[in-house]
Amino acid sequence: MAVIGIVSITPALPLIANELNISKEKIGILVSVFTLPGIILTPIFGIISDKLGRRFILLPSIFILGFFSILSFFARDFYLLTIFRFLSGIGAASLGAMNITLIGDMFDNVKREKILGYNNSVLNLGTTVFPFLAGILANIHWSLVFALPSLAILIFIWLLTSFKDIAPAPKISEKYFRNFLNLLKNKVLIKIFIVNLLTYIILFGSLWTYLPLLMSQRFNAEPFFIGLTLSSMSFTTSIFSIFFGHLVKKISYIKLFSLSFILYSIVLFLITVVSEWYYLFIATVLFGIGHGLNLPNIQAFIIRLAPDTHRSGIIFLNRTISQVGQTAGPLISAGILFLFPNTNVSINAVFYFSVILGILLAVFSQFISTKNN
């Protein structure tokens, strides 16, 4: 549920743009407006979760996501669809952080890194299957892609009777907020937040939002093949996430960061030069390897730096930063498209920008200490 609201619609973005007569600069709004509510609400949900428990936030969130996704299915006007996407994004705001919080609640330090790898594997299994299914559904009708996040209603009904809070909710006091603010002075934590922000600007500014547009315009690819290509990246990510717990025993966290971002840059450049759409499989598989090393690495740092009493708040703040990247990425790319009216040049410029960010991240990650300071 944490990823379905985005990855289930990206294969259909070119088709939605054509059907609703929306320009290539505006179509990314459907992604940005979904992630926008999380920028404000996610840290608030994290604090409430620490005070009132995980169930208090989790159940309403899943219901809201499902309900407004159903309404999105029936929308035939771009602006109405945008409103429903925004409202469903309110429901999705807490979900990406909640699963990490629950892992922190349930497992000790010895098991967390392995479980984080498994969690990312499951997460990316979703981002493998859903774009593929969305591509099939979009070939029937573009609105059917919104049927997938509507499944959240069924999850809500199941959790309503089966989910109970695992961790006791501590009292929120002035001391809690004071200690929380002190945690934000941690230099390592700040650097990880920066890495997380730029990672999602790359991911959503180029791959998830504008790779479908590139495939549609340059190769005339149908939604099914767009979904298949995006799924290949997520499948590889899920495989490598499984082995994260083993890899960190042999390769340092910092080297894994560097390898991830170097792969990002290589892949994003390759995307601009391939001559046939099926060559993109090589690029997306390589990107999936890099992302499978990067994402659990970020999460492992965050959990290790966050004490039990503030874990939810810190994880939710990190999720907020992710959503800033998810929101800003498509908007930055839209700005690049606006600056370069020629379609081929503008699409390439979007990916060149991400190549530069990847190189900068590879250098920046070398200044991250593995010590808590």
Short names for language-model regions:
Residues 21, 53, 74-80, 108, ...:
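Helix-breaking motifs and short loop linkers at transmembrane-helix boundaries and internal kinks
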Residues 40-76:
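Conserved MFS/SLC helix-loop-helix module at the cytosolic interface between two early adjacent transmembrane helices
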Residues 118-161:
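Helix-loop-helix hairpin linking two adjacent transmembrane segments in secondary transporters
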Residues 164-193:
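Juxtamembrane intracellular "pre-TM" segments in multi-pass secondary transporters
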Residues 78, 84-123:
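Cytoplasmic helix-loop-helix junction between adjacent transmembrane helices
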Residues 68, 79-87, 278-286:
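Paired small-residue
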Residues 42-53, 240-252, 337:
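Helix-to-loop junctions at the C-terminal end of transmembrane segments
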Residues 150-169, 361-369:
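C-terminal membrane-cytosol helix-exit motif in multi-pass small-molecule transporters
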